[in-house]
Amino acid sequence: MRFQLRKCSKCFQYTLKEICPKCKEQTISAHPAKFSPDDKYMRYRLAERYN
């Protein structure tokens, strides 16, 4: 399954396209990464987020 919904990081508009039709910026996936209790790198992601 391929995630199709994308979000512009500049104007925060949701779209299905790779380029935002409003501001012409690159869009990113609007879906979070899958959760895994065996995640080896969770410590680093949490440190990056909260420090």
UniProtKB/Swiss-Prot annotation:
Q: Which InterPro entries match?
A: H/ACA_rnp_Nop10, H/ACA_rnp_Nop10_sf, Nop10_arc-typ
User: From the record, what ranges are coiled-coil?
Assistant: none
This protein's UniProt keywords = Ribonucleoprotein, Ribosome biogenesis, rRNA processing
Recorded hits in SUPFAM superfamilies, A to Z, give: Nop10-like SnoRNP
Select a single GO molecular function from the record's annotations and give it: snoRNA binding
GO CC annotation: ribonucleoprotein complex
**Which Pfam families does the record match to this protein?**
Nop10p
Q: Kindly list the biological process annotations in GO that this record carries.
A: pseudouridine synthesis; rRNA processing
Source superkingdom: Archaea
* Job description of the protein: Involved in ribosome biogenesis; more specifically in 18S rRNA pseudouridylation and in cleavage of pre-rRNA.
Family per record: Belongs to the NOP10 family.
User: What's the protein called, per UniProt?
Assistant: Ribosome biogenesis protein Nop10
Gene label: nop10
